[in-house]
Structures are given as structure tokens and as C-alpha cells.
Amino acid sequence: MVNKNRQLKEQKVAEIKEKMGKTEAMIMVKYQGLNVEEDTELRKALREAGVEYRVYKNSLAVRAINELGYEGIAQYLEGPIAIAMSYDDPTAPARIINDFAKTHKALELVAGYVQGEVFDVNKVKELASVPAKEVLIAKLLGSFKAPLSNFAYLLSAIKDKKEAEEQA
């Protein structure tokens, strides 16, 4: 029986380790005080953004974090903690959770681990203010478009001027 229990725990640690090893960002929150409806609303918003939201037994999560060599983050796993993990957009979990916490005071940001760096609450809030990757790409493309449009207009004006000179 003890062996079976230990084996199940080792499997769970391996699963947690696999998920955490692939993440771009992990944001930890205290969720105690959220009712079922609020928790479901948060989970839905995170799921729609491709963010996985899990509650793990802290001792198993700490073991996975230590095995991965993620230093400085295990200390935040005390009490009822949920972890939001994003596999592609490092800003998504911070942004969604921060917005949700503004209207649901029971949800409390604890810390984050983003691309190998530990983020305290203030850094997580800064990360939350960074626009989504798609918005940043759109802004970048927009900044390229304006000079290109101006250059095309300039070429058109030169062409029109030459045509006018040839006709004169």
C-alpha cells in the first residue's frame, strides 16, 4: 500500500514537472475566498487564453520545482495556492489574473516565475500591464506601415511630377 501511494505521488510529481518545464510563465495566486461561480469564471477566462490553471498539493509542486532547478519560487507555495501556467504567451496569466483580482478581492497574486526569473507581486503587476503578443505585433506592423505608406506617396508624387514635366 505504501509503495502504491509513493508511486502515485512520483507519477504526479513527474506530471507537474513536465507541465512546469514547458511553461513560459507561472503565476501563483491565493484563491481562498472565491466562490464556485467566481472560480469557474476565472478558469474560463484563463482557458480561453490558453492558460492552464491548477491546484496541486504544495509538497508535490515543491518537489517538482526543486527537481527542475527553479530557484527562489518554492518558498511561495504555502497555504492554498493555485498556479496558472502559460505555454506561449508569458503575459497572459498575469494580465488575466490581475484584471480578475481588481474586481474579486478574494483572489490575491502571490508570485510568478517567468522565463527563468522569479517575479514578486509588483513585477507580476508590471508584467500584467504589457499588452498581449498579438497587440504588440500589430503595433509593430503599424509602425512599419506608416513610413512605407509615406514612401509610396513620395514615389507617386515624383512620378506625377515627371509626367507633368514631360507633357510641358
UniProtKB/Swiss-Prot annotation:
It comes from the Bacteria. InterPro entries: Ribosomal_uL10 (IPR001790), Ribosomal_uL10-like_sf (IPR043141), Ribosomal_uL10_bac (IPR022973), Ribosomal_uL10_bac_type (IPR047865). The keyword Ribonucleoprotein applies. Keywords: Ribonucleoprotein, Ribosomal protein, RNA-binding, rRNA-binding. SUPFAM superfamilies: Ribosomal protein L10-like. GO terms for molecular function: large ribosomal subunit rRNA binding. GO terms for cellular component: ribonucleoprotein complex; ribosome. The keyword Ribonucleoprotein applies. Gene3D superfamilies: 3.30.70.1730, 6.10.250.290. GO terms for biological process: translation. Pfam families: Ribosomal_L10. Belongs to the universal ribosomal protein uL10 family. Forms part of the ribosomal stalk, playing a central role in the interaction of the ribosome with GTP-bound translation factors. HAMAP family: Ribosomal_uL10 (MF_00362). Part of the ribosomal stalk of the 50S ribosomal subunit. The N-terminus interacts with L11 and the large rRNA to form the base of the stalk. The C-terminus forms an elongated spine to which L12 dimers bind in a sequential fashion forming a multimeric L10(L12)X complex. This is Large ribosomal subunit protein uL10. It comes from Clostridium acetobutylicum (strain ATCC 824 / DSM 792 / JCM 1419 / IAM 19013 / LMG 5710 / NBRC 13948 / NRRL B-527 / VKM B-1787 / 2291 / W). The gene is rplJ.
